[in-house]
Amino acid sequence: LLSFMLTHKEKTFTQRQLAEELDLSLGTVNILLKKLKEEKWVDEELHLTELGQKILEPYRVKNAIIMAAGMSSRFAPLSYEIPKGLLQVKGERLIEREIRQLQEAGIEDITVIVGYLQEKMFYLAEKFGVKIVVNNDYYKYNNCSSLMLVKNQLSNTYICSSDNYFVENPFEQYIYRGYYSTIFAEGQTDEYCAIEDSNHTIIDIQIGGENTWAMVGHVYFDRAFSEKFKEVLETEFKHEPYREQLWEDYYSRYVKELLLEARHYSADIVKEFDSLDELRQFDERYLVNADSAIIDNICKTLKCVASDIVNIKPLKDGLTNTSFSFDCLGKKYVYRHPGRGTENYIDRASEAASMEIAAKLKIDHTFVAMNKDEGWKISEFIPNAKQLDYDNWDDVTQAMDLLRRLHQSGEKTEHSFDQFEGIIDFREKLKARNRF
């Protein structure tokens, strides 16, 4: 009530209007206002006094942390080209909209943690006056590693994801207690779900559920939560296996000590897009133009339009590439996207020439196209595919038959490869990238 009155200090409200605005009964508002007047926190005209503003001060939001380091691999293929937070939705970049909403709520101390494609995020510092922290471990650890970098900033702090879209501004300048935003998931969900008591305090967390409150969106750490959570974070992060977990996993193990409210929001207000198909349902522009070179590559190769490309599913990453499957015009395909920096140690032109020969000899029946300059490839999808089992003689025999057919074909390319020199060269390049 005090926070509402401060936010709307230029206006005068009746008790009935306050009850409607705050979704409280008229009787409850009457009792609260009587108490506030007795304490001299509001005056007879129901305006906040100087003492009332002082009482609010411990509940003022100090800062916000925006998590933007992850690769968002589920959001293929757009996340292969730009960080998910830089996607434009309804004409605004996700992270820019979030920063503006925080600043409109009076929160100026904002830190953005970057990692994957970090250089594309650096402009935010100059444009919005935010601080940038780089997480160089983004590719091997989970978001707990990001919080470790800013643990000393945790206080009365918003923890935000760069890829949420808030239809209405959910941020406030004063908050009574810490909370995790939740939306009601109709049917099955694989999100983390909050189990709460009658006061909406989260008392347990389960992964996945049905017709339940899913933990989606922003989080607010109050000062008491932050002090305890910092201890938990430092303790848990010492264990190497735990570094691959979400900070929510740490929280769930100490949920009885780390108190947060489950704050309920409408799914029409808090949006999280886990796939291009979901984004298309909210922003129809992506049906026509996804602003993606990858989508353009597919359209040109398969003679289709962007809306024909559906059911995109990330596949397990290879050693040097990232791939996803998709449906297009009644057939299923795989798009292979070259990993960053692989052009330094993989000769894509040589690979493309070999691929074309394998297709010509009917050794590879799936090959559709490969770009020898950029390294991307499109193939037909093979259901129930398996890797070669070197201990299975039937597998080895089939593989050797294919290799024999290739080497006895007489086909040649203009490329050559010395495997021993190649191994030495590969090792040196990995060392130079601190990946060996």
Report each predicted region and the residues it spans.
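Active-site catalytic-loop/activation-segment of kinase and kinase-like phosphoryl-transfer enzymes
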Residues: D277, D283-R285, A293-I294, D418-F436
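Conserved beta-loop-beta/alpha segment of the NTase-like Rossmann-fold superfamily
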Residues: E119-Y192
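A short, conserved structural fragment
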Residues: K37-L46
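Short amphipathic alpha-helical interaction segments
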Residues: D23-K35
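Conserved alpha/beta core of the MobA/IspD/sugar-nucleotide pyrophosphorylase nucleotidyltransferase superfamily
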Residues: H47, L51-A64, A214-K300
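N-terminal glycine-rich phosphate-binding loop and ensuing alpha1 helix
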Residues: S3-L6, E21-L22, K54-Q118
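ATP-binding pocket architecture of kinase catalytic cores
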Residues: K313-D418, K429, R435
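Conserved core of the sugar-phosphate nucleotidyltransferase
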Residues: V42, V167-Y242
